[in-house]
Amino acid sequence: MTSLVEVTDLTIDFSSDSSSSVRAVDGLSFTLEAGGALGLVGESGSGKSATAFALLGLHRGTGARIGGSIRVDGTDVLTAQDAELRRLRGGRAAMVFQDPLSSLDPYYAVGDQIAEVYRVHHPKASRRAARERAVEVLDRVGIPDARRRARSRPHEFSGGMRQRALIAMALACEPRLLIADEPTTALDVTVQAQILDLLHDLRAETGMGLLLVTHDLGVVAGSVDDVLVMKGGRAVERGPVADVLRSPREPYSRALVEAVPRLDAVRPARDPQEDVLLEAVDLRREFGRTTAVDGVSLTVRRGETLGVVGESGSGKTTLGRMLVGLIAPTSGDLRHSVPPRALQMVFQDPVSSLNPRRSIGESIADPLRAARELDDTAIVARVRELLDRVGLNPDWYHRYPHEFSGGQRQRVGIARALAPSPALIVCDEPVSALDVTTQAQVVGLLGEIQRDLGLSLVFVAHDLAVVRQVSDRVLVMQDGRVVESGPADRVYDAPEHPYTQALLAAVPVLDPQESAARRTARRALLPVG
């Protein structure tokens, strides 16, 4: 069988300053056969995206130093002239990037952008033929009313439709290789499932090779033949996807697999108290003519975790902000048996919620200073205690947010929420931006803190597997309303509402056979999005 991709002893170095460099990829070798599918899996900083970019020569002009050898469809990428690389890119090999908004020109219609790519590689094609090809591929990737939507601009598409449009652009010239770099990371679970199903179907129809770059092992389970696990720029393990996911040989691969949240996870037994800490009755929140939350009622008991799940636009984040008083409801009643400062929040993005010009110690101290109950010496001591409580070195008090990793910054956010000794913390997507092992660590930390301090948690997320790990009861939201609620085991094991069933059917699983079966089962449940 002919190798479509051959990478031999690849090294990639980036200059960090005038005298030093960072090695992003170190001695990597692999092949991808024509028509095959390989998953390149690793956490942030593993070198997987740098490798994918190098396959198309996208390192040129970045200051990166490349060593080794890369051949893609017979082209020596490292020695090829620019003209030869242009013929390769988009023609015989194409790439789908993580963020479609940054890849699509906001000024031009989506169909015109696809037609332009087609004409670059087919200069004799007429404008009309190129536009017809754009409509054809948009229709193929599942864009409804493709001829009309080809005239739409990117902002008029949903996130899932923009990703479909990028895939259509990549398919315009019938490439032999498609490189997909984290193509579903920013998408809701049902849209993610649709995109992965689309890639699977396109492979089957066209025979193209697929290199799928991702940090999510669940994503590769039903999408590729082989998996290459990367860590620190090196290949840790490679093998058939079923073998690597079921019986990983290397400790790092095993740690990745064990950290993946599962729908069948056994939750630690908890015995929440009967007294109600917070009660919401018929909460409604409108923004102009848009209703974000529409008549939601709930209770949170002392010591329990209430999971709130839903996709983008479901109203779950707005609900969470109302519960802690950051947003006032338009109507409805919100009652709590503790003072307002006992209701705290951990935000999704710690980068935007921490002041980059202030040390993390000072940020954690803010709610303590606002209370005016402790002197400066006591405040510093309390902050150091909190840093230690969340697993950070107390001596890091004077460090700034940019000096920490994403998981460490989220620990800082948790420490700040703990500062006023809260009774309830609303966690808004606290692990959605984290690698799977860091995600598991943060979830474990929250559970440990809850057990030790007797806290109540409202855990807001779109990841149903994570929510099951932590929740006693679950609310499922769609379009601002609660469509299903109940004990977590009942909602997950016997969902009643079609939307809940569709969400659960779309959750990635680690078993390739089960993944294939779920793909078949969900086709009748999931609309195009």
Question: What positions do the PLM features span?
Answer:
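Conserved ABC ATPase signature
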Residues: 152-157, 161, 400-404, 408
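A short, proline-enriched helix->beta-strand linker immediately N-terminal to the Walker B motif
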Residues: 172-176, 419-423
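Helix-to-loop junction immediately C-terminal to a conserved catalytic motif
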Residues: 56, 60, 324
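ABC ATPase C-loop
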Residues: 165, 170-171, 412, 418
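Conserved ABC transporter NBD signature motif
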Residues: 64-76, 331-341
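ABC ATPase "signature
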Residues: 235-239, 247, 482-486, 494
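Conserved ABC ATPase "signature" region
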Residues: 76, 129-148, 377-395
